[in-house]
Design a protein with these regions (language model features):
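Alpha-helical residues within the helix-turn-helix
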Residues: 25-26, 43, 116
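Conserved amphipathic alpha-helical core elements
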Residues: 41-42, 248
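Residues within the DNA-recognition helix of helix-turn-helix
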Residues: 30, 37-40, 110
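Central regulatory/effector-binding core of bacterial HTH transcription factors
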Residues: 91-151, 300-301
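Short helix-boundary/capping micro-motifs
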Residues: 13-28
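C-terminal regulatory
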Residues: 136, 148-262, 288-304
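A short LG(V/I)-centered, amphipathic sequence patch enriched
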Residues: 42-59
Length: 304
């Protein structure tokens, strides 16, 4: 096989961006050069390495095997560059997706701690709330809410987090504090846009409090928190985010709550790459350190 190493690295760049134009820009090449390199790789390997999708280019089975080799090459080159200080295998770029809250309060501090030990590591986080993808071209790690149903992927549970009802102290002073769950029908909900919600497990408030109508909805959980603090309505919020704000009061913590799991998804061979294995462990460690807040045991401002 006379496959050129450069062709594999070009495929790696395309797999991470899903687009020839972006890969070309990142590599300092032209679009036509990237196209030629991919065509040459297809000829050398005897099959297609990429397939078109709605979001760009996705790896075929052959392409995934080729990218695994390219990642090993990338790691080896990075190790050679660190020979003066001793090889640090936790280097390169790791790309992950996660929900907004997880990205801010779990992933971000985990990455910060990890990079203090491994400054050659770079992590790209795309915030999104959705089910796990069946094709994850360009992604190393996905963190999703709810147990995923995936093929040709490894899934592991990271831990649970709790959601509860919250209202601002000013809102309760103006509108009155509901004395029971039944009285929630007199108030409106701050939560996700129902028609755009892609995760079934997150549809809890429509099941738990069906009489509540929407006040303000958004695809971003930080909007939920700030809208609730501003008095837009009663929010159904992750406790580890809401309990950070002393102006928010948790309502009916013993009866109006939902506990959901965070799951991590990655390709079966991804843990062979030291950078990915290190980040996965860092995320687990941060989940454990933050467990009390995640499970709703960090707040003191409650109304039963």
């Amino acid at each position: 096989m006379d496959t050129m190493p450069n062709d594999l690295l070009v495929l790696l760049a395309v797999s991470r961006t899903a687009k020839f134009t972006t890969a070309a820009h990142n590599l300092g090449l032209t679009h036509s050069t990237v196209s030629r390199r991919i065509s040459a790789l297809k000829k050398s390997l005897g099959g297609r390495v990429l397939a078109r999708s709605d979001d760009g280019w996705e790896l075929t089975d052959l392409g995934e095997r080729a990218v695994a080799v390219a990642e090993q090459m990338e790691t080896a080159v990075a190790e050679l560059g660190n020979t003066r200080q001793g090889p640090d295998t936790v280097t390169g770029v790791v790309r992950m997706t996660a929900t907004d809250g997880f990205s801010a309060y779990i992933a971000s501090p985990a990455v910060a701690k990890l990079r203090r030990r491994h400054p050659g590591l770079s992590v790209e986080i795309v915030t999104v709330t959705r089910q796990a993808l069946q094709q994850r071209s360009g992604l190393d790690i996905e963190v999703v809410v709810g147990e995923p149903r995936v093929h040709r992927a490894e899934a592991m549970k990271l831990g649970d987090y709790e959601l509860g009802l919250y209202a601002s102290s000013d809102y309760l002073a103006a509108r009155g504090t509901p004395a029971s769950v039944d009285e929630l029908s007199d108030h409106r909900l701050v939560y996700f846009v129902d028609s755009m919600l892609q995760v079934d497990d997150l549809d809890a408030p429509r099941r738990l409090f069906p009489s509540m109508k929407d006040a303000l909805t958004s695809t971003n959980v930080f909007v939920h928190v700030e809208a609730t603090r501003a008095g837009a309505g009663i929010g159904f919020l992750p406790c580890f985010m809401a309990d950070r704000h002393p102006d928010l009061v948790r309502l009916f913590p013993d009866t109006a709550a939902e506990r959901l799991p965070y799951w991590l998804v990655l390709r079966p061979d991804s843990m062979r790459r030291p950078a990915i294995a290190a980040l996965v462990q860092a995320l687990k460690d941060q989940m454990l350190a933050y467990r009390g807040a995640l499970e709703g045991r960090g707040g003191t401002n409650r109304h039963n």
